[in-house]
């Protein structure tokens, strides 16, 4: 509905250009917002006030002119001017009912799909040297929610798990694995549970033994040169590490697969060409033996030029080099329209520099959008980055285990007579959902406090509340098994029916915001408001005990669409629903 009103206004402004009321080359920014006070209509715009200078008219006069020239629309019951020149639109109840009717049974819930784009989404991307920890959670689940929503809206999505599977640390790891094999024979295996121990032991040997450090550096050179023995060990290590990652993904309900892994090593053969091309374009400068690029717009606080280091003095490459190669691949091979990077906000400057350089060097098409969708940190209740009691990094599997244990206690306390298998399944869903939703419901760019107590509450904007809200709506149909709704029609008469209908009609607008800005918290807030709107409707408008069959069937259809929207919305967040709690 919002986009429909925007279209009416765009048509009107275009006619003003043709009539000479506005300059022919005038670019208008039209904003339509939902009103908070329904006495002021359903939607409002301040476009008349924005155009007053260009049109040479006072805002109220221009507002009336806009109203007089609006194309006819069955969706609009009336239009009024308010205050200094706001234009308020009142939506026709029967038109809204028809829109909701069309959404029932439609796989996209009546949402008009945008023109499809090819969108590359770079998310999760852990280093393969260690087990996944809580620091990987935000990129993984925020990215996955946006991916799911993009696909639901008809876009072609290419997932890219840009894992850290290359670099100098792998020489250290290979050297230590080599020592273990020498001591324990070819049967020695690195167990998943030993990843952290293995890394720490290798680092300790590297720091304490000059001989070991020399061997590690030799193995890096051999690995980069394509040595078969080193590559075999490297692949084995990566396989073990990736297996761990994908166990975590499966447990989290994340859609990443092995086929989506396209790590740093995938661009090894392209790095020399990146350097050569930058040199050929006259962009490279030598600084202390390193090859760097200076861009005028990037300077330190003291005004000194801030370089992008492309190649170190010893010939090694850096993240910037790999990122430039990846951008070129995503532009020229994957043909992306947008590339979204879900990476910590602390990398903002890095991405600003490499995005700018990629465009400057013409490594990417001018029309390809490069977007760093950064995020804040997960903090403990002391406001500091989330750690174990001993100050260590919290492993993601340990966090999920704790969530499951707490959820099981919670569900058992509410269902003391439930069988263990059902308890375990409900606890699994509630525990994982609580962790994911607590993160997704926060503004992506904000830090947030991690609290098991808050996230497992059945009150407020939490996963348990929404999961219960869904089971409550779906439960109506367990008591209405003999009702035929095939010929039923939605009729909006009661104010709470209209409120629920208006909220249901906003689903498409909300999803557009999720994919345009990479902000799943907007969807979380919407689902919470939808659950509240249904609760108010259910209290005020008897469903199964309605006054007559027509009213009963209409309210059942509203309930059905609410259940479908809640379920789809939670699914887009990567959250399973339950039929009972």
Swiss-Prot record:
Belongs to the class-I aminoacyl-tRNA synthetase family. The gene is argS. InterPro entries: aa-tRNA-synth_I_CS (IPR001412), Arg-tRNA-ligase (IPR001278), Arg-tRNA-synth_N (IPR005148), Arg-tRNA-synth_N_sf (IPR036695), ArgRS_core (IPR035684), DALR_anticod-bd (IPR008909), Rossmann-like_a/b/a_fold (IPR014729), tRNAsynth_Ia_anticodon-bd (IPR009080). It comes from the Bacteria. Its EC number is 6.1.1.19. This is Arginine--tRNA ligase. One of its GO terms (molecular function) is ATP binding. Its main location: cytoplasm.
């Amino acid at each position: 509905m919002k986009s429909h009103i925007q279209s009416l206004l765009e048509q009107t402004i275009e006619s003003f250009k043709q009539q000479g009321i506005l300059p022919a080359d005038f670019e208008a920014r039209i904003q339509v917002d939902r009103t908070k006070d329904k006495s002021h209509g359903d939607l409002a715009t301040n476009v008349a006030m924005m155009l007053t200078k260009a049109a040479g008219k006072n805002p109220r006069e221009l507002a009336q002119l806009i109203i007089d020239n609006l194309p006819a629309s069955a969706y609009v019951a009336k239009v009024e001017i308010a205050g200094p020149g706001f234009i308020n639109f009142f939506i026709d109840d029967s038109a809204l009912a028809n829109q909701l009717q069309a959404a029932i049974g439609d796989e996209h819930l009546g949402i008009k799909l945008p023109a499809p784009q090819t969108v590359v989404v770079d998310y999760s991307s852990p280093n393969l040297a260690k087990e996944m920890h809580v620091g990987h959670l935000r990129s993984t689940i925020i990215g996955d929610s946006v991916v799911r929503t993009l696909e639901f809206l008809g876009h072609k999505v290419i997932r890219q798990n840009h894992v850290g599977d290359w670099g100098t640390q792998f020489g250290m790891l290979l050297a230590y694995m080599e020592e273990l094999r020498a001591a324990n024979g070819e049967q020695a295996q690195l167990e998943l549970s030993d990843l952290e121990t293995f890394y720490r032991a290798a680092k300790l040997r590297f720091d304490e033994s000059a001989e070991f450090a020399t061997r590690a550096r030799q193995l890096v050179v051999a690995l980069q040169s394509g040595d078969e023995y080193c590559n075999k060990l490297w692949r084995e290590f990566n396989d073990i590490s990736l297996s761990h990652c994908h166990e975590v993904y499966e447990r989290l309900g994340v859609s990443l697969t092995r086929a989506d892994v396209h790590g740093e090593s995938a661009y090894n053969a392209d790095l020399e060409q990146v350097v050569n091309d930058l040199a050929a374009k006259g962009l490279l400068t030598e600084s202390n033996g390193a090859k760097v690029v200076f861009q005028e717009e990037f300077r330190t606080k003291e005004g000194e030029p801030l370089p992008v280091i492309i190649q170190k003095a010893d010939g090694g490459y850096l993240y910037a080099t790999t990122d430039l190669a990846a951008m070129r691949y995503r532009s020229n091979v994957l043909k992306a329209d947008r590339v979204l990077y879900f990476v910590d906000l602390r990398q903002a400057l890095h991405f600003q520099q490499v995005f700018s350089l990629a465009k400057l060097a013409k490594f990417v098409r001018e029309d390809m959008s490069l977007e760093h969708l950064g995020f804040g940190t997960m903090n403990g209740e002391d406001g500091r980055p989330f750690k174990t009691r001993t100050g260590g990094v919290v492993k993601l599997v340990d966090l999920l285990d704790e969530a499951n244990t707490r959820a099981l206690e919670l569900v058992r306390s509410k269902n003391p007579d439930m069988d263990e298998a059902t308890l375990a399944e409900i606890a699994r869903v509630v525990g994982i959902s609580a962790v994911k939703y607590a993160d997704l419901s926060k503004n992506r760019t904000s830090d947030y406090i991690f609290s098991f107590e808050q996230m497992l509450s059945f009150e407020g904007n939490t996963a348990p509340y929404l999961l219960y809200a869904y089971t409550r709506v779906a439960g109506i149909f367990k008591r209405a098994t003999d009702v035929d709704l095939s010929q039923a029609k939605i009729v909006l008469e009661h104010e709470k029916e209209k409120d629920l209908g208006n909220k249901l009609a906003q689903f498409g607008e909300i999803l557009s915001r999720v994919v345009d800005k990479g902000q799943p918290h907007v969807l979380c807030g919407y689902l919470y408001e939808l659950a509240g709107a249904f609760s108010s409707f259910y209290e005020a408008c008897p469903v199964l005990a309605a006054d007559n069959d027509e009213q009963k069937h209409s309210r059942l259809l509203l309930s059905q669409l609410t259940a479908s929207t809640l379920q789809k919305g939670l699914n887009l967040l990567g959250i399973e629903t339950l039929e009972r709690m």
